[in-house]
C-alpha cells in the first residue's frame, strides 16, 4: 500500500503537463506577436478587450495587461510599480486590504500606501465605491484638512493609492486615551472638520461617513479627513440620495428611516462627533444596536450642564432629527461657520494653519509610530505587496478585475509629480 507522501506515476505526469501548459499560456499572454493574435486562441483564453461602449468613458483607459507598466506621468517619468517602494510597516487595515508606511526609492519620501485586493472588492460588489473614493481624492489637493492623493496605479490583483502619510494618530485613538476633550480643543477640531466638509459640499460631494476613526491628526495636530469610500458624488445643493450606508453610532434619523437624505447628513455626523468629543460617547449610544437606532429615531437629545450655552445650542441644531430644520439646511457650511460657538475662530487663519493646534502629537519623524496600533505595526509586511511580477497567468477572474477598474490609475501633472 502506498503512503500519502508517495506520488503515483499518473500524478507526476499530470503535474508535468500542467506546468508545461502554464508556461505556454504565459508566453501567449505576455507576447503580443505570439499566437494570441489568432482569433480562436483569443476566444479560448477570453482575453480580448471589452467592446461594450458602456464600459468605457472619456476618462477611461484600457485595462493594463500583466506585462504592461502603468505610466504615472509624461514619458520622461518612470512607470509606477510596487517595487518602486520599500514597504516598511503595516499601519492600518480595512475590509479590502491594508495601509502601509512606504518610502519611495527615487525621492526617499514617505507615503501611506493603501493596497486593496481586487477580488475582495469584486466579491462584495464595491468597485463603484472604490472608484468614487479615487475620484474624490483627486479633488482633495486644494484643501489642507483632506488627505491628498499623489498618484494611483494597479497590478493585475491589487489597487494602490499613494497618499499623504499622516502619523499623529486617529482622533478615535486620542479620545479613547483621554476620554473627552475640553471645549476649546473640541471647537478647534470641529472647525477644521466643518471646513473640510464645507469644501466637499462645494464640490457636490456628501461625505457620509464622518466618525473619529476617519479623522486623523497630522504631525502638528491639525485635522485630516481620510477614507472617502462612502462619499456620494454629484449631489447638488438641493439634491438627495437614498443609499443606506454609514456607521451605526453616527447614522442620521433620515438614513435609518430609509428616506431620501441630503448633505445635512454630514452636519448630523459633525454633531455626533462634537458630542462625543465633549462627553466621551456618541449622543444616542447603546451596546444594543437596535436600541441605539430607536434612540436616534425617538429619544430626545440629553445634554449635561457642563458645556457652554453656545455649545449646547450648536449640538441641538446639528442633532435636530428633522433635517429640514437642522443647522446647515439652508446655507450649508456658512450657517456652521457663523454660529456663536465658533466666534473665537478666525476662519482665514484656520484655513491657512496659522492657529496653533491645542494638542501636539510630538512625533519625532516619519518613523515614529507611537500613535499607531501595535496590532498593525508588529505584523510582518507580506513580500507580495512590493513585488512587480514580469508576467502572470491570466485567468477569467483577473480579466474581470482589470475591466472593473479601468481608469483607476492616475498621475499628477509633471510639475506636481511626487
UniProtKB/Swiss-Prot annotation:
AGC-kinase C-terminal domain sequence ranges: 343-418
Residue positions binding ATP: 91-99, 114
Residue ranges of every copy of the Protein kinase domain listed in the record: 85-342
Region described as Disordered: spans on this chain: 50-78
First-tier enzyme category under EC: transferase
InterPro entries in the record: AGC-kinase_C, Kinase-like_dom_sf, Pkinase_C, Prot_kinase_dom, Protein_kinase_ATP_BS, Ser/Thr_kinase_AS
Extent of Polar residues compositional bias: 68-78
UniProt-annotated location(s): Cytoplasm; Nucleus; Endoplasmic reticulum
Annotated Pfam families: Pkinase, Pkinase_C
Transmembrane residue ranges: none
Reactions catalysed: L-seryl-[protein] + ATP = O-phospho-L-seryl-[protein] + ADP + H(+); L-threonyl-[protein] + ATP = O-phospho-L-threonyl-[protein] + ADP + H(+)
EC number: 2.7.11.1
Matches recorded under SMART domains: S_TK_X (SM00133), S_TKc (SM00220)
The entry's keywords: Apoptosis, ATP-binding, Cytoplasm, Endoplasmic reticulum, Kinase, Nucleotide-binding, Nucleus, Phosphoprotein, Serine/threonine-protein kinase, Stress response, Transferase
Alphabetized CDD domains for the sequence: STKc_SGK1 (cd05602)
A biological-process GO annotation: apoptotic process
GO annotation, cellular component aspect: endoplasmic reticulum; nucleus
Molecular function per GO: ATP binding; protein serine kinase activity; protein serine/threonine kinase activity
Active site residues according to the UniProt entry: 209
Family: Belongs to the protein kinase superfamily. AGC Ser/Thr protein kinase family.
Function text: Protein kinase that may play an important role in cellular stress response. Plays an important role in activating certain potassium, sodium, and chloride channels, suggesting an involvement in the regulation of processes such as cell survival, neuronal excitability, and renal sodium excretion.
The protein's name in its UniProt record: Serine/threonine-protein kinase Sgk1
Organism: Xenopus tropicalis
Organism classification: Eukaryota, Metazoa, Chordata, Craniata, Vertebrata
Amino acid at each position: 500500500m502506498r503512503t500519502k507522501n508517495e506520488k503515483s506515476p499518473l500524478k507526476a505526469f499530470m503535474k508535468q503537463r500542467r506546468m508545461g501548459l502554464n508556461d505556454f499560456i504565459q508566453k501567449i499572454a505576455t507576447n503580443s506577436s505570439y499566437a494570441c493574435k489568432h482569433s480562436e486562441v483569443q476566444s479560448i483564453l477570453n482575453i480580448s478587450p471589452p467592446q461594450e461602449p458602456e464600459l468605457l468613458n472619456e476618462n477611461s483607459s484600457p485595462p493594463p495587461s500583466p506585462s504592461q507598466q502603468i505610466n504615472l506621468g509624461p514619458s520622461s517619468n518612470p512607470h509606477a510599480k510596487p517595487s518602486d517602494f520599500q514597504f516598511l510597516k503595516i499601519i492600518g487595515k480595512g475590509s479590502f486590504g491594508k495601509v502601509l508606511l512606504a518610502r519611495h526609492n527615487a525621492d526617499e519620501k514617505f507615503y501611506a500606501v493603501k493596497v486593496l485586493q481586487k477580488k475582495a472588492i469584486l466579491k462584495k460588489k464595491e468597485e463603484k465605491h472604490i472608484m468614487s473614493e479615487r475620484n474624490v481624492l483627486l479633488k482633495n489637493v486644494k484643501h489642507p484638512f483632506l488627505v491628498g492623493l499623489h498618484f494611483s496605479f494597479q497590478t493585475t490583483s491589487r489597487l494602490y493609492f499613494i497618499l499623504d502619510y499622516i502619523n499623529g494618530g486617529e482622533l478615535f485613538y486620542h479620545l479613547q486615551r483621554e476620554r473627552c476633550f475640553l471645549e476649546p480643543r473640541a471647537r478647534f477640531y470641529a472647525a477644521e472638520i466643518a471646513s473640510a466638509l464645507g469644501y466637499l459640499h462645494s464640490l457636490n460631494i456628501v461625505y457620509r461617513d464622518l466618525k473619529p476613526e476617519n479623522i486623523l491628526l497630522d504631525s502638528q495636530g491639525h485635522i485630516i479627513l481620510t477614507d472617502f469610500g462612502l462619499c456620494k458624488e454629484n449631489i447638488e445643493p438641493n439634491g438627495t440620495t437614498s443609499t443606506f450606508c454609514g456607521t451605526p453610532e453616527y447614522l442620521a434619523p433620515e438614513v435609518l428611516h430609509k428616506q431620501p437624505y441630503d448633505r445635512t447628513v454630514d452636519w448630523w455626523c459633525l454633531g455626533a462627533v462634537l458630542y462625543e468629543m465633549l462627553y466621551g460617547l456618541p449622543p444616542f449610544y447603546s451596546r444594543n444596536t437596535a436600541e441605539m437606532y430607536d434612540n436616534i429615531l425617538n429619544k430626545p437629545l440629553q445634554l449635561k450642564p457642563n458645556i457652554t450655552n453656545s455649545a449646547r445650542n450648536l449640538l441641538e441644531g446639528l442633532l435636530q432629527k428633522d433635517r429640514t430644520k437642522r443647522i446647515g439646511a439652508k446655507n450649508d457650511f456658512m450657517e456652521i461657520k457663523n454660529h456663536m460657538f465658533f466666534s473665537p475662530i478666525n476662519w482665514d487663519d484656520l484655513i491657512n494653519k496659522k492657529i496653533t493646534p491645542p494638542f501636539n502629537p510630538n512625533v519625532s519623524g516619519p518613523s515614529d509610530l507611537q500613535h499607531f496600533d501595535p496590532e498593525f505595526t508588529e505584523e510582518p509586511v507580506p513580500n507580495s505587496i512590493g513585488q512587480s511580477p514580469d508576467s502572470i497567468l491570466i485567468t477569467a477572474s483577473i480579466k474581470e478585475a482589470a475591466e472593473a477598474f479601468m481608469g483607476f490609475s492616475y498621475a499628477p501633472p509633471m510639475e506636481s509629480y511626487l
